[in-house]
């Protein structure tokens, strides 16, 4: 297991766990690893962007200093979504990109996420290479002077280029359906009105006035209550919520019900399949997707391939086997005909397009999807790495698996960013899901709990 990199880059409390000093080292060491193969005389180019957190500029300046110290030319994009940066890295032919964001996490946190020249997250091997340099007893990387140093160029026009890209993925304007959009006071806040107005959408917004401190503050993809209330209050047909860096989208139907990533993929995937455009009649998800999702697909003659948790692994599976739709229950949805990473705004507009083209409400499009009751318990633990070595835990899991058979499941995994073990169950009834989840969580707490 990696020391600094989690499932989504390096994260921590800004100016405590994730310090400017650490950002400098990540810029210097990460920049070197990603650009060391440039031919002599060729300047490496790296794009840097951030979300709206107050700590973003502090970490950005430190990170950029690290990049400049190994001779890298930096294009400073400013505030933009994570998928926006991913797109611009490819569009600009850059060697790499770095996004400063902690996504859906609270404002105290921040993170640093690297992308390769293909706009994709780094492999475990690349992250391990960076970590070895960070922990090296001596810094032996090049230290150019004068003309060998990098410089910074403002590239704030990148946002307009990214919005144009999204608009070009849709064949027509999207008027006629009333939408409420929640920007989470995050990176999408300044982009939503431009994009949705350009597409002719009848929309209103909430949480699009970031002040550096209010990102994800009871709004956004992980806090949809306010959006649900607004959809009902305004008589809207759809609500769309993004998270802090807008790489995920959660929807709300016309009745105020939350619609997660599984449901969104089902709607878009079914539409693509009906039009002969769902490659291999398959949608790729992680092991966290609801069992009801798989069974709903099977009723339509479609298939579901599952990966370990993390949109990076979904993306890898899609590219390896030629699938064009995948994602996570949490709202990361990859429509690879257009983009190679989860993109909240792209996903939201394509969901809206399906509603417009079919003339159906979101609840109608989901009428065949019967979700299995689910329970998730996060158990704080001392050390999440060796949980499989605890016989009582593995035996408790096996017992539940045998009792549920193919009418439910249990899944235990370590958090990628926190000292937690996540215990998740699905069963035909909520009572059973609660019972089995609580049983296993109790054993985990007794064996490994941090209290």
Curated annotation (Swiss-Prot):
The record describes the protein's role as:
Catalyzes the conversion of glucosamine-6-phosphate to glucosamine-1-phosphate.
Record EC number: 5.4.2.10
Q: Where is the active site?
A: 103
**In-chain residues carrying the UniProt-annotated modification Phosphoserine:** 103
Q: Which positions form S-S bridges?
A: none
Q: Which PANTHER family match?
A: PHOSPHOGLUCOMUTASE (ALPHA-D-GLUCOSE-1,6-BISPHOSPHATE-DEPENDENT), PHOSPHOHEXOSE MUTASE
Q: Which reaction does it catalyse?
A: alpha-D-glucosamine 1-phosphate = D-glucosamine 6-phosphate
Q: Which superkingdom does the taxonomy of this entry point to? A: Bacteria
Report the family membership.
Belongs to the phosphohexose mutase family.
A GO molecular-function annotation:
magnesium ion binding
Post-translational modification note: Activated by phosphorylation.
The name this protein goes by in its record: Phosphoglucosamine mutase
Cofactor names from the entry are: Mg(2+)
- Give Gene Ontology CC terms: cytosol
Q: Where along this sequence does the record place binding of Mg(2+)?
A: 103, 243, 245, 247
User: How, per the record, is the cofactor bound?
Assistant: Binds 1 Mg(2+) ion per subunit.
Picking any one GO biological process from the record gives: peptidoglycan biosynthetic process
Q: Which UniProt keywords apply?
A: Isomerase, Magnesium, Metal-binding, Phosphoprotein
